[in-house]
């Protein structure tokens, strides 16, 4: 093989390698932000087994609830573009000493219709432990006004739980992440 042919072949191979590297550089971010596959019914008790403890035997004397706004979809560009987000709901037991009983974790859509209930029965969360629920990016059943209701209880005085939803998503090269804090549910009005 002549030196000129070898040089052309090497140049062509180098050009092809640069093209493949450029193509990989363009496609890799797309693969990283592709939506997660929607899962079937998730057994939260099994997934969070390390965070759970035995249910308290004493009466549950204290209880409360949280309303947590969640945004599985957000309208952008004057409503012309919808960006879908994954949602991770985290329920943190802020007590260092007591178990926190989670009675209900329910997911509702924009119209207020229950989409999913995540507990078969109440579970007890270890001190300082966390339980999470993940809504994949391609699960848009909640819409732009989705929310969670989390009901909890304890045997006595306890640090109020911390409940938040983390939304993560993106479009093209723009990525977004934001947190929505749970708000305690209370009856408001005249006494």
Q: Would you name each region that the model predicts?
A:
Residues 110-147:
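Intrinsically disordered, low-complexity Pro/Gly/Ser/Thr-rich segments with frequent PxxP/GP/PP motifs
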């Amino acid at each position: 093989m002549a030196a000129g042919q070898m040089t052309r072949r090497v140049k062509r191979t180098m050009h092809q390698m640069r093209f493949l590297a450029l193509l990989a550089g363009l496609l890799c971010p797309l693969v990283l932000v592709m939506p997660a596959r929607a899962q079937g019914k998730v057994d939260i008790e099994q997934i969070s087994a390390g965070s759970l403890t035995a249910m308290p035997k004493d009466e549950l004397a204290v209880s409360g609830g949280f309303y947590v706004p969640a945004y599985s979809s957000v309208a952008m560009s004057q409503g012309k573009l919808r960006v879908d987000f994954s949602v991770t709901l985290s329920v943190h037991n802020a007590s260092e000493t007591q178990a926190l009983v989670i009675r209900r974790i329910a997911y509702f859509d924009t119209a207020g219709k229950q989409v999913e209930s995540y507990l078969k029965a109440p579970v007890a969360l270890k001190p300082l432990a966390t339980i999470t629920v993940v809504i994949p990016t391609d699960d848009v059943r909640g819409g732009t006004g989705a929310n969670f209701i989390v009901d909890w209880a304890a045997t006595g005085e306890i640090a109020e739980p911390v409940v938040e939803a983390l939304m993560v998503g993106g479009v093209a090269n723009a990525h977004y992440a934001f947190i929505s804090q749970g708000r305690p549910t209370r009856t408001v009005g005249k006494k």
